[in-house]
Amino acid sequence: MVLTDPIADYLTRIRNANMVRHESLVVPASKMKKDISEILKREGFIRDYEVIDDDKQGVIRIFLKYGKNNERVISGLKRISKPGLRSYVKSDAVPKVLNGLGIAIISTSEGVITDKEARAKNVGGEVLAYVW
């Protein structure tokens, strides 16, 4: 199956698994998805992830995180830059998500980083997604 937007598929799988409160989910692996998973883990949106290597592409198993009383940690995920309409920002226009409560995931020349890191490094790039 050919996907035109693998990042949107990745975010949708996380959103769907989160809505029905699954413990984990599996997505096809890529370097970009590994980088985004690392950011989500570091920022506390997911519990953990592991890369399972098979003879082909490999998969990433993501372990979702829930709070007390099984409440969701991820309230929302939104794809910003799409294949048909790319969204780039300069270093002085890096967006804040919900006044700092969420994160923007940005692909820069420094790699895939959060909006806070982009402001600290004074770099812009392609805004991939918002997570809150």
UniProtKB/Swiss-Prot annotation:
GO function term, MF aspect, one: rRNA binding
Top-level taxon of origin: Bacteria
GO cellular component: ribonucleoprotein complex; ribosome
BP terms from Gene Ontology: translation
Keywords: Ribonucleoprotein, Ribosomal protein, RNA-binding, rRNA-binding
Matching SUPFAM superfamilies: Ribosomal protein S8
InterPro entries for this protein: Ribosomal_uS8, Ribosomal_uS8_CS, Ribosomal_uS8_sf
Tagged with keyword Coiled coil: no
Pfam families: Ribosomal_S8
Matching PANTHER family: 40S RIBOSOMAL PROTEIN S15A
Function: One of the primary rRNA binding proteins, it binds directly to 16S rRNA central domain where it helps coordinate assembly of the platform of the 30S subunit.
Family per similarity comment: Belongs to the universal ribosomal protein uS8 family.
Assembly: Part of the 30S ribosomal subunit. Contacts proteins S5 and S12.
Protein name per Swiss-Prot or TrEMBL: Small ribosomal subunit protein uS8
